[in-house]
Amino acid sequence: MSTRRSSRANKGQHSKREIDFYVDEEDLPSERKRSLSNSSQDNKRPHLDQDEDDGDYKENGEEKKDDDIEEEGEVRCTPCGTTSENYDEDSDQGGTMIECESCKTWQHAKCMGYRTSKTIPKHYRCNVCSGLNGDKLEKTNVDSSAISEKLKDKTRASVAKAFVNVFKRNIPESYKSPEGMDNEKLSSKWAIELEREIFIWCPKKDKKYTDKSRSLMVLIKKPNVMTRLIDGELSFTKLVNSPPEEIDSELKEYAERVRSESIRRSVLTVDANQGQRIRRTHKGEEIVEDASNQQEDVDISIMTRNIDHRRFEDEEPARGIIVNDNSKPAYNNYMEDEDDDEVGEEEAEEKQKQGSDKEGSTSDDKEGLPSSDIDDVPDLDDDELDFIIKGKKETKEETRKPSSIKLPPIFSSKIWSGRITFPDFASFGATGEFYTCSNYKNPTNPQEVKLHNRYVNISKEILSKDHYEVEGRLDRTRADAYLDKIITTRDLILVEIKCTENRSGYDKLYRYLLERNKVGVLSGRPAFVKDAYLLGIDGNDFNLPEYLKALHKMVGKVGLFALYIVKKDYVPTGPSILKKSTPNPTDYNSHSSNASSKEKTPLLDSILYKLGGNGTKKENIQIQTPQYNPPVAQNGLPTSLTTDQLSYLSGLVQQNPQVQQNPQALIQLLQQQKNTDYSPYH
């Protein structure tokens, strides 16, 4: 009697059944390939017991219905001690169960020594009915259970057991195993070593681990790979870490053939018989149309569209082009003129030349046309197009003559000199040079020069003092995280600090900031600067923050830098606005050199008011209307300004020429002059 399968087999899959994925079904006869989840319907068997879920089946041409709805038999698995009393179908971990044909009891297939479904015989009898005792079964399972003892993890144990089966079937019989080892022990040893290498390569035991195990099982089955393993030419480490193409030469050759075939199919080919270009795509072969290939069966109405109808107008020929010996185009209107007699002979010669030149070039296009008069008419369209193209080429050559573009003046990067002090730690003299900023490039065109000069002016406006102190310290990690986020909404400006005095103090501060992973907070930052830091930067560090890598020329740079976080797209008021220099006294002849600072405030307030700068008005200055707009002269200054006010403004504009085209900058300059103690009359 053939083996019965319980309905338990398809009610829950045990985790160890994943070993079945690694079994090669090609190694077994076709009649042995059957599923444990469904009952077999092989008509060749003389007897077949169906479960209550199997339905009807046909045997020897007669339809029978399974009326055997009896209860499932008793569970009696002596190796593991499972009985009907302690057996729970949902929580059982023993795997597939099989029924004895003699006593109708159920046992675990693996407890009976059947590791896979392929090893279960057609006619099964349990260990009691067959006369096998438990000692014999335990002895047969010693070698197969050794892997489970070494590999506690079920997944790893299943993969290792699958490798054991592969090695057993593929190790040649002619191979002499080492002393004290047979084929089975050698297979177990190699399987454990190979699984260990896979686990090292992918310790997560996920899909990547499973796919790698399957691919290696396929490789091991190849005779050339097994030969390399036996000879010691290929180690398990190399087998796991190398791509399959390097392990199997046949697979590499196949991949090369596939790659070359793919390239060949993507190349356009020409059919010599049909004169057509063919492109092979995933949709099949496509014919690529060529303008030079004319179809013989094209409608004559389509052909007439390409004919210039001016060729048929003999009475008043259209404007043509006469080509001289130097191939330079010249026009002929073909109109009656007083000079026709003088140029008539030249026209006749040129027409003969044009007719002979065009005869060969247009013979293909005019083939098959009904009229023979077309052959004598020159193709004017091509000549006109050639003339237009030549004319454009000449204009391009003329525009390309200026080889170099004159760049505007580039401001010097040296912007500051003074002293930096870290109280009770270090102090040194230094200079500051603008080094880089956000979106900065080396100035090679006028736009980049303008950007460079703008950031130089901003840097000068920032570093307006002679002495700066380190007011505090921040952790570099927190500062880097903050700067990585703020770089998208602010501009970063880096000024390189170079030592001019007390090099030891400079080096001491640099090493402190770099080794202690600190950032110094600088004093004296203007209102438009959000933060000012002093950084020790090593551009060769692999852990260089992303905001520094994004800046130009920072990779590989080493030194002390002042970093300023500025408002996005900030426009400086000019490099000389904050410069407190005494004006030339010749510009103020109408003023006394002994004027006091009290005289300046009313003057500036009046100027600011008249210019719309919201100056503070004194009691003796009366405002008639809030919307008063003073008349403006041609030079851009209000005509209501007094001589003293005009003279004062003239001196400021001479000192700061950049405000001449920027009225708002002039107002800001006046406001700054008002808020300082400096007086131009001292």
Swiss-Prot record:
GO biological process: regulation of mRNA 3'-end processing; transcription antitermination; transcription elongation by RNA polymerase I; transcription elongation by RNA polymerase II
Coiled-coil ranges per UniProt: none
Cellular component aspect of the GO annotation: nucleus
Annotated Basic and acidic residues bias: 57-67, 350-368
Compositionally biased region (Polar residues): 579-596
Molecular function terms from GO: RNA polymerase II complex recruiting activity; RNA polymerase II transcription regulatory region sequence-specific DNA binding; zinc ion binding
Biased composition range(s): Acidic residues: 335-349
UniProt keyword Nucleus, yes or no: yes
PROSITE patterns assigned to the protein according to its UniProt record, in alphabetical order: TFIIS_CENTRAL, ZF_PHD_1, ZF_PHD_2
ZnF (PHD-type) residues: 74-132
Boundaries of every TFIIS central domain copy: 155-275
Record's keyword terms, sorted: Metal-binding, Nucleus, Repressor, Transcription, Transcription regulation, Zinc, Zinc-finger
Stretches for region Disordered: 1-93, 309-381, 576-599
InterPro entries: SPOC_C, TFIIS_cen_dom, TFIIS_cen_dom_sf, Zinc_finger_PHD-type_CS, Znf_FYVE_PHD, Znf_PHD, Znf_PHD-finger, Znf_RING/FYVE/PHD
SUPFAM superfamilies linked: Elongation factor TFIIS domain 2, FYVE/PHD zinc finger
Listed Basic residues bias regions: 1-14
Location of the protein in the cell: Nucleus
Similarity field: Belongs to the BYE1 family.
Record PANTHER family: TRANSCRIPTION FACTOR BYE1 (PTHR11477:SF11), TRANSCRIPTION FACTOR S-II ZINC FINGER DOMAIN-CONTAINING PROTEIN (PTHR11477)
Function: Negative regulator of transcription elongation.
Protein name stated in the entry: Transcription factor BYE1
Species this chain originates from: Debaryomyces hansenii (strain ATCC 36239 / CBS 767 / BCRC 21394 / JCM 1990 / NBRC 0083 / IGC 2968)
